[in-house]
A protein has these predicted regions:
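Alpha-helical interaction segments
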Residues: 4, 26, 62-66
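Feature detects long, helix-prone N-terminal segments enriched in hydrophobes
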Residues: 11-13
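A short, structured beta-strand/loop element
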Residues: 15-49
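C-terminal structural segments of small proteins and small subunits
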Residues: 51-78
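Negatively charged, low-complexity tracts enriched in Asp/Glu with abundant Ser/Thr
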Residues: 1-9
Length: 78
């Protein structure tokens, strides 16, 4: 599970087996998880996060979209 970055208690990562899916990022905090597609940035699924947190997380994903895509390509294209 490569971690792309952390912001506070949130960990942004992807799974090694995610190669066959479109570019996306998982976010976790404690037992809460979410998955965002990146092109365009949109929520795919969520478990445990409140709506306000999801909105904040989506903004963080948008703000770091380029970094996430670069990390994805570097990991899966090597």
């Amino acid at each position: 599970m490569p971690t792309v970055f952390k912001i506070g208690a949130y960990r942004f990562f992807f799974y090694s087996g995610d190669r066959d899916e479109p570019v996306h990022i998982h976010v976790e905090k404690e037992d809460n998880v979410a998955k965002f597609w990146l092109d365009p940035v949109r929520l795919q699924k969520s478990g445990g996060f409140r709506a306000r947190e999801i909105n904040d997380l989506q903004k963080k994903v948008q703000d770091n979209q380029e970094q996430i895509i670069e990390a994805w390509n570097e990991y899966f294209n090597n």
